[in-house]
Amino acid sequence: MPDHKEEKIRVYRNPAKNEEYFKNRVGMGTSYDVGVRKLTILDKEIQLYYLNGLCDTAYIIHLMRELVAINNRKEDPDELVDIVENRLLNAQVEKVKTLDETTDQVLSGLVAVIVEGAGFAFIIDVRSYPGRNPEEPDTEKVVRGARDGFVENIVVNTALLRRRIRDERLRVKMTKVGERSKTDLSICYIEDIADPDLVEIVEKEIASIDVDGLTMADKTVEEFIVNQSYNPFPLVRYTERPDVAANHVLEGHVIIIVDTSPSVIITPTTLFHHVQHAEEYRQAPSVGTFLRWVRFFGILASTLFLPIWFLFVLQPDLLPDNMKFIGLNKDTHIPIILQIFLADLGIEFLRMAAIHTPTALSTAMGLIAAVLIGQIAIEVGLFSPEVILYVSLAAIGTFTTPSYELSLANKMSRLVLMILVALFHIKGLVIGFTVLIIAMASIKSLQTPYLWPLIPFNGKALWQVLVRTAKPGAKVRPSIVHPKNRLRQPTNS
């Protein structure tokens, strides 16, 4: 968030002025959740400012008991500030001299304790955000592996990452983004691995974000730090799995954690980062390689399968005699291109309906879509059976794509290729696919080539992409992130 140069107001020594400031600044007395508790200790007023719902109420009650107990002892009123400081039994207590920062901290869920005449506020971290416990992400499930996942609490997410990387060189830099929302955001990397230039680029991009609030959390941050424009391909990778995030941090990537989001942003990324899945690394290298190739085939099928089949329908002479069955077995009244688009649109309707349908009704909805709509549409001649079959196969290929954002981009590419094939036949397919590759090769994500290690070519890195190698054999980190320390394992191992 860019610096807005305004004169900071220091904490008043007069309690009445501090209370007036909070009434004017945050609407205390108007907003029901902004609270203040005033205590008289040793003939001086102590104010506790807090936000209902974001603080641990039990601790606030405990704190008030500790402060009131001071009256039961013979203490020097001139030493009240030191006495109060010693009574603040909490792991995180800091002194803040301005009311602006005090207000921001209170709105973040911390408690401010202001002693009359002190001229500063004690800020106590007793945040207790409402939220859920870590659980396995729905979109990144594995047969073997951890069952925890990121949640909407940045403190919990940082702890999940710290639990996996207990390295004293792991850095978690906290900042606030959003002029009004002041959303907490942290940048995570390992100091002696991550490229300092990459860290500087990410920090500068985040510091330059000038927006009212991060209502869409990490997605808003993404649109500011990378020049997405109308490019459908994802330029950063999202993950809800702490083990995946930790693995990328150890490779030299920079992770961005945004409060209120159950996903973290991995930067920088290439196309091949979006086609990897944690399941491949939970199986034997040979099995992991097999799963990876099956996934690659599904991703390619989701993009190219339908355009190629449609080309064979338009030009049956391209097929050898023993493969003529791939085409249409009978003519239909509706153009094939329209059938394909309608079937694809129907699958999108089904996907959107599944998202908004309660779990208890989703099975019934699937049966209605698959049996009633699909079967009846074929029987009445609206669709040919081949169209339903091949559109379904392409849809299954879409679902095998680990990255949801990449699957949508591939679907858009497929529709464009379909139109080009309908207009120009084989020339349209060749030209469209060539333009697609050139466009992807020209993309850069935080100065990282999108098609690396294919373009520019790096044989060793490409082998790591195509084959799931055993961990003892993966001794160096990917060169694309320019790590300060390329060795994954100690030199004496």
Swiss-Prot record:
The keyword Oxidoreductase does not apply. It is found in: Cell membrane. GO terms for cellular component: plasma membrane. It is a multi-pass membrane protein. GO terms for biological process: spore germination; sporulation resulting in formation of a cellular spore. Keywords: Cell membrane, Membrane, Sporulation, Transmembrane, Transmembrane helix. Its main location: membrane. It comes from the Bacteria. The keyword DNA damage does not apply. The chain crosses the membrane at residues 296-316, 334-354, 363-383, 387-407, 418-438. Belongs to the GerABKA family. This is Stage V sporulation protein AF. The gene is spoVAF.
